[in-house]
Amino acid sequence: MRAVIQRVREASVTVAGEVVGAIGNGLLILLGVCHTDTAEDVELLAEKIAQLRIFSDHEGKFNLSLLDVGGAALVVSQFTLYADTRKGRRPSFTAAARPEIAAPLVDAFAAALRARNIPVATGVFGAMMQVALINDGPVTLVIDSAELRLPRRAGSRVDS
């Protein structure tokens, strides 16, 4: 399970001209589900995001979590996060979970955040959506549940 999280002042998602989800201060979470993801990935990622200290304290340091600031989350499913662009000019999405597997896991992820007392708004799974946001910072991170399982010394997927 892969999430692109953006710290926002506000964000909304529109489907067919109607706003279906909106938040104020918090995180926009673009969520991709891999064909190997399970409920364990849901819990691992939800816990990490809920506790991640990416909001500034009174000294301007990243010391506060989404929970600490009373922020909300806007969760938008996005299978394109599992695009494979290594070959050709058209991305392949074979690593992305099929909708019948992905949709329940996206719902479970939103529920896992709610269970941690985070207000959650969502997009519509499988719909063409327009996402609007005002970045705060900007602060944007990519978190992958598979990487969260690696030993800390294993390094990241991209060497600097």
From Swiss-Prot:
Compartments in which it is found: Cytoplasm
Subcellular location, principal: cytoplasm
Any one Gene Ontology BP term: tRNA metabolic process
GO MF terms held by the record: D-tyrosyl-tRNA(Tyr) deacylase activity; Gly-tRNA(Ala) deacylase activity; Ser(Gly)-tRNA(Ala) hydrolase activity; tRNA binding
Enzymatic reactions: glycyl-tRNA(Ala) + H2O = tRNA(Ala) + glycine + H(+); a D-aminoacyl-tRNA + H2O = a tRNA + a D-alpha-amino acid + H(+)
Disulphide-bonded residues: none
CDD domains named in the record: Dtyr_deacylase (cd00563)
UniProt keyword RNA-binding present: yes
Family label: Belongs to the DTD family.
Subunit comment: Homodimer.
Entry protein name: D-aminoacyl-tRNA deacylase
Organism for this UniProt entry: Chloroflexus aurantiacus (strain ATCC 29366 / DSM 635 / J-10-fl)
